[in-house]
Amino acid sequence: MFQALKESKDFLNLTLAHPQHIDETCSFSVGDHTQVEVWDTGVIVFEPKVNQAKDIVLSCAVHGNETAPIELCNELVTALLEEKLIAKQRVLFLFGNPAAIINGTRFIDENLNRLFNGAHSSGEGLVNPERIRAKKLEFYVDKFFAGQREERHRIHYDLHTAIRGSKHEKFAIYPYRPGRKFSGEQIMFLEACGIDTVLFHHEPTTTFSYFSSLNYQADAFTIELGKVLPMGQNDMTRFIALKEMLNRLIGNDPLELSAFDVNKVNLYQVCRAINKEFDDFEFTFTNDVENFTSFPEGYILAKEGGNNIKVEHKVEAIVFPNAKVPVGQRTVLCLKPATTENIDLGN
């Protein structure tokens, strides 16, 4: 099994051949510089023999039909195995939901990105593949981060694509960070990747990026890289800047980041999440409305249970509208312009 990986250098192929689990782990060297370990299906670690200061997690396929990040991560893994890219920082790649990749669907039974921070074991417990996988992914992130000194720089980029189009093609969600400022340097790293829009979340969630931010104080982001497309139909030239910056990060090459400049980025503050309370929940706007579409104060965004849900601020933009979620889950995030007061500008 692992001999095939060493010959083909195609980790995605190995992952999809064993979508549920791999019975045995393996470890091998690439050249005289990197130790490689496969911990499970879709879980591979590159450990430089001369260790540096960063621990990097790159995750994709938390939703199985979000294919551009899957292709990007597999290209990076292949480059590392072929020694076209040499790891100078520790890096863990996670292909989140292999069964859903094969199925070409967002998930099999349940949205994996609503099952972290222990949500996998709440309620009915570990009753489906996504809940079991969420618990395993938490374990692998813990194994990767916890064995290192806390002063190391921990990073987690959870890569996605969105269901609908967006006025800002690429954007990132910066998880809630009580008592910690947001990193201006990380925002400018994202800008150099071609991701010029950042949303600051306002509350705890059960997402993968918040798990790493909360438990390991990682600079963690949920990163949206455009719209969902079938495997092989992504225009990978749209990710040249992102791939180049990830190559530099992993290879410990100079990042050459600009100083923080608010004029180069679009910053939004999440002001509320609207959860579905009744089965009759419906939006008033059409299904083709793009992410970051703005609505004026008083505008009726949605209706449910005989009540109108209105825009509360002077202007609110919306992201991730989805009326089809189960009762109790989030239907949309509402945004307002953000200030820089809670950003560490590095001055």
UniProtKB/Swiss-Prot annotation:
Any single GO molecular-function term of the entry would be: succinylglutamate desuccinylase activity
Class in the EC hierarchy, top level: hydrolase
- Protein family (similarity comment): Belongs to the AspA/AstE family. Succinylglutamate desuccinylase subfamily.
The protein in question is named Succinylglutamate desuccinylase
Keyword Metal-binding listed? The answer is: yes
Catalytic-site annotation from UniProt: E224
Alphabetically list the UniProt keywords: Arginine metabolism, Hydrolase, Metal-binding, Zinc
Q: Which cofactor does it need?
A: Zn(2+)
Per the entry, what this protein does is: Transforms N(2)-succinylglutamate into succinate and glutamate.
Q: What is the lineage of its organism?
A: Bacteria, Pseudomonadati, Pseudomonadota, Gammaproteobacteria, Alteromonadales
E.C. designation(s): 3.5.1.96
- List, alphabetically, the InterPro entries matched: AspA/AstE_fam (IPR050178), AstE_AspA_cat (IPR055438), Aste_AspA_hybrid_dom (IPR007036), SuccinylGlu_desuccinylase (IPR016681)
Q: How is the cofactor bound?
A: Binds 1 zinc ion per subunit.
HAMAP family the UniProt entry points to: Arg_catab_AstE (MF_00767)
Q: Does the keyword Zinc apply?
A: yes
- Pathway, according to UniProt? Amino-acid degradation; L-arginine degradation via AST pathway; L-glutamate and succinate from L-arginine: step 5/5
Instruction: Report residues binding Zn(2+).
Output: H63, E66, H160
Q: Which GO terms describe its biological process?
A: arginine catabolic process to glutamate; arginine catabolic process to succinate
Query: Which reaction is the catalytic activity of this chain?
Result: N-succinyl-L-glutamate + H2O = L-glutamate + succinate
